[in-house]
Amino acid sequence: MASRDSLGEVFRVSIFGESHGPGVGALVTGVPPGLEVDEAYINRELERRRPGGPYASPRREADRVEILSGVFRGRTTGAPILLFIRNVDVKPGFYEEFRYKPRPGHADYVAYERYLGHQDYRGGGIFSGRRTAALVAAGAIAKLVLARYGVRVYAYVKSIGGVEARVEPRDSEEFRRAIDRDPLKCPDPEASERMRRLVEEARREGDSLGSVVEAVAFNVPPGLGDPPLGGVDALLARAVMAIPAAKAVEFGEGFALAFMRGSEAHDSPRAVGGRIVHETNRSGGIVGGLTNGMPIVFRVAFKPPSSIPKPRRTVDLRSLGEAWVSGKGRHDPVIGPRAAPVVEAVTAIVLADLLLLREALLPEWVEDLRPWTRGEAGGD
């Protein structure tokens, strides 16, 4: 059973650190030996999430990983991999006011109750998006595992403030470059331009915007998952909902399925070139908690960032009197662009774990046990 700070059973990721502590990091266990990896590769992944730029927090973190164990001469050893990212640009003085005056939308009050007032409140502590850097670093290792199976994951900003990208995700480096070269991680140039104007307007008004990130995983084999509680959609939902500010997730057509008829909602299988495919993908590649061989498609909704300059009413926890707070510190006007690489990373972590678990439980020789390979007719 995964703990509150970890994901996975075979490929297991545990994260640690706080926003304004010495740093954040991840312990990754269950990594096969012999995978080629170095700090430069992980740093390139971290660069995709790093703050800065006109549409993100001005906090300037170098985000350079240190591999402290589990890698020798550029290859994984099979031992646990400890990844550490130092915090450099910390300004804890911004947050003293919020120790007893919880910010609306932040975890300040609930953390005060949960940890009896002993929580690290600087920058949100363990509730800060800063810890997602550790997930991205661990996700870089997970992607090396996925590459062995030919599985690739992409995540991009689907919408900001109601402006929606109209793109067909593709399994190509060209599609990845289109995501990464856009400052909002939106591969639709026209939609991105409209999104930028909205973000700039919200920032001028001292406000923030909500966003949706879509993730797509290609070449995932059918039959992956361990339902009911270990279904692929259940595990992915748990993982992405642990990302700060995530508030909803839907797979395939998601909530739109509630407004369809059964005759139009379900994906019909057919045989093409000796393999089973589906005519549509309204289920998002997952049925009954198991993958069906189609691309996994899901979307994550992120609320508008809670820290905004506009004054808002709160309560002083010492006197229980009314108080007012405004967003100090350095914060993002919209979360989606920096969350997209995080969604991609946790998706890779979940799928790497499931693939390695399947390999451990179902070695290649079990294919001989399928009914038709034994000449059994099937059916009752």
UniProtKB/Swiss-Prot annotation:
Disulfide-bonded cysteines: none
Question: Which keywords annotate this record?
Answer: Amino-acid biosynthesis, Aromatic amino acid biosynthesis, FAD, Flavoprotein, FMN, Lyase, NADP
Q: What cofactor does this one take?
A: FMNH2
Extract one GO molecular function annotation from the record: chorismate synthase activity
Tell me which positions the record assigns to the signal sequence: none
Give an example GO cellular component term for this record: cytosol
Q: Which reaction does it catalyse?
A: 5-O-(1-carboxyvinyl)-3-phosphoshikimate = chorismate + phosphate
Residues given in the record as NADP(+) binding sites: 49
Free-text comment on the cofactor: Reduced FMN (FMNH(2)).
Q: Which domain of life is it from?
A: Archaea
The protein's matches in Pfam families, at most eight in alphabetical order, are given as: Chorismate_synt (PF01264)
Quote the CDD domains the UniProt record gives.
Answer: Chorismate_synthase
**One biological process term in Gene Ontology:** amino acid biosynthetic process
Which Gene3D superfamilies does this UniProt record tie to the protein?
A: Chorismate synthase AroC
- Metabolic or biological pathway: Metabolic intermediate biosynthesis; chorismate biosynthesis; chorismate from D-erythrose 4-phosphate and phosphoenolpyruvate: step 7/7
**What EC number(s) does this enzyme carry?**
4.2.3.5
The top EC class is lyase
Q: Where does FMN bind?
A: 288, 303-307, 330
* InterPro entries registered for this protein in UniProt: Chorismate_synth, Chorismate_synth_AroC_sf, Chorismate_synthase_CS
Name it.
Chorismate synthase
The opening ranks of the lineage are:
Archaea, Thermoproteota, Thermoprotei, Desulfurococcales, Desulfurococcaceae
